[in-house]
């Protein structure tokens, strides 16, 4: 595997993982608020 591919993909994977982490955290917060309003 070419090392240049890794140099290009690594920041993209880090950014993608960070976005998923942030979106997941916000979704969990909203779900908890929704569930607490229901009860």
Curated annotation (Swiss-Prot):
Top-level taxon: Bacteria
Membrane-traversing stretches: 5-23
InterPro entries for this protein: PSII_PsbY
GO term, biological process aspect, one: photosynthesis
Membrane-related topology note: Single-pass membrane protein
Keyword Thylakoid annotated: yes
Annotated localization: Cellular thylakoid membrane
Alphabetized UniProt keyword annotations: Membrane, Photosynthesis, Photosystem II, Thylakoid, Transmembrane, Transmembrane helix
GO molecular function, a single term: manganese ion binding
This protein's GO CC annotations: photosystem II; plasma membrane-derived thylakoid membrane
Function: Loosely associated component of the core of photosystem II (PSII), it is not always seen in crystals. PSII is a light-driven water plastoquinone oxidoreductase, using light energy to abstract electrons from H(2)O, generating a proton gradient subsequently used for ATP formation.
NCBIfam families xrefs: PRK13240.1
Complex and partners: PSII is composed of 1 copy each of membrane proteins PsbA, PsbB, PsbC, PsbD, PsbE, PsbF, PsbH, PsbI, PsbJ, PsbK, PsbL, PsbM, PsbT, PsbX, PsbY, PsbZ, Psb30/Ycf12, peripheral proteins PsbO, CyanoQ (PsbQ), PsbU, PsbV and a large number of cofactors. It forms dimeric complexes.
Record family assignment: Belongs to the PsbY family.
Name of the protein: Photosystem II reaction center protein Y
Gene for this chain: psbY
